[in-house]
Amino acid sequence: VSDFCGTCQKCMEICPTQALKSPRVLDANLCISYWTIESRKIPPTEVRKKMGDWLFGCDLCQTVCPWNQKIYKSKLEISEKRSLSESDRENLIQDLKFILESSNRQILKKIEKTPLMRAGPKGLKRNALIVIGNQKLVELKNQVQQKITDDFLGPLAKEILIELEN
């Protein structure tokens, strides 16, 4: 296999969790895309804290790759801004509220024939709780509280509630 990367390390530099350990070596146990799309488990706390507001996937490594940017015939801009505008925050709150308040059937109907099906309703609810904790979205405290009795989400919901109170 040809090595097109040369000395480029843009993907390694941008990865929020340092999942790329060295050129072409990925530790999936640290990868946001793995945890938000593929995994059916709750990510470890140290990974969750680095997930920020990533609800589904990440792909920063793919976006900064010069070889991928050639496909777009222009340089893709990556924002260094890590805080949400007020309107972005409100939109995020509404989306997360929908995910947590909706039944699995309602979510499936909404995400049908989209890549979000890969995570499914259970994964999206898990991811929503993580985003709420990371972004300190106290406006959704009631929705988090409602998940405490859920067999899968309950332990995570309890941790998120503690985070929201601190």
Predicted regions and their residues:
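Structural detector for internal amphipathic alpha-helices that build alpha-solenoid repeat scaffolds
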Residues: K125-Q135, P155-L164
